[in-house]
């Protein structure tokens, strides 16, 4: 679907800067990313809460033993 929007010069500059910084191919890709973020407005807080719950559970030592098995980060 094709959609036309009106944005201020400031908004276009911000969008262009984000597209360039993120290595996205187009303004459309930048807007699509913004819409995906809008779908899950609490996702960042949800991850922060999950991390705090995990940290408070006291499983840090067991996890450190597990990740110390010599396997590094997978290439992305």
UniProtKB/Swiss-Prot annotation:
Induction, per UniProt: Mildy induced (5-fold) when grown in a non-replicating state.
The UniProt record lists the keyword Hydrolase: no
GO annotation terms (biological process): detoxification; positive regulation of growth; regulation of DNA-templated transcription
Pfam families with a match to the protein in the record: RHH_1 (PF01402)
CDD domains xrefs: RHH_NikR_HicB-like
InterPro entries tied to this protein: CopG
Keyword Signal: no
Molecular function per GO: toxin sequestering activity
Free-text function comment from the UniProt entry: Antitoxin component of a type II toxin-antitoxin (TA) system. Upon expression in E.coli and M.smegmatis neutralizes the effect of cognate toxin MazF9.
Protein name: Antitoxin MazE9
UniProt organism field: Mycobacterium tuberculosis (strain ATCC 25618 / H37Rv)
Lineage: Bacteria, Bacillati, Actinomycetota, Actinomycetes, Mycobacteriales
Gene name tied to this protein: mazE9
